[in-house]
Amino acid sequence: FPTRRSSDLMLTIKGTRGDRMVLGIPNNNVRKQYYDYLKEMFEEKSPIDTSKLDDCFYDMAYEGKWQEGLTFLAESYAKVSSVRDGIEGERNIQGFFMAYLNLCNYYITAPELELNHGFCDFFLLPNLAHYAVKHSYIIELKVLPKKDFSALCEDRKTTKAEAQWNEAVAQIHRYAEAPRVKALRQDTLLHKIVMQFEGWKLKNIEEVE
């Protein structure tokens, strides 16, 4: 298939998601190389305070305080995107989040993990072999172009943003109910987080009960 960037050459086809291909990184060495490449690319545009990020990761892992860290990542993404010709899209956001979540030693970050016949964007699996982590996370990212965010759906009753949010809530509930989740999260408390973007700006972030 055609590639848009040189980094695409480092990906391989892992499966399908409807009529789309699910791309994955073939092995751990290539994975590290790929996400190091992404991180360097983003750092050239707008460096991130990784010391602050480390503190946020600690709070997520041990205190269950996730909002500051994920909001910080979203705001950092907005700074990068605002100087990158207005590039928008879920794939771009996923790449950014993966590059920086991959810095967190408290978790094994699993992107596009199949759960209940769907694929969650990120599952932060507790790295209990090395850290006494108390909390784990499923994170679902949703993106709408600016022109569509406030537009009405065909029923003329709800906006496209509202419909997308409701879909994300239903999806993340379904992922969390997958039989394998209990084994994956082990004895940690699972948090289900939905993040919704209007273009490159975070508009909504919430823990789904």
Predicted feature locations:
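Generic alpha-helical structural element
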Residues: L23, Y58, Y62, D85-G86, ...
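Long, non-coiled-coil amphipathic alpha-helical linker/lever segments
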Residues: Y34-L70
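Glycine-centered, phosphate/nucleic-acid-interacting loop/turn motifs that mediate DNA/RNA or nucleotide
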Residues: L9
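Generic, low-specificity signal for short hydrophobic/alpha-helical stretches with a mild N-terminal bias
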Residues: T16, R20, K39, S51, ...
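Structural signature of nuclease core domains in nucleic-acid processing machines
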Residues: W66-E209
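Accessory beta->alpha helical hairpin/"wing" motif in late/C-terminal subdomains of nucleic-acid enzymes
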Residues: T12-K45
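Short, small-residue-biased leader/transition segments that mark boundaries at the very start
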Residues: F1-S6
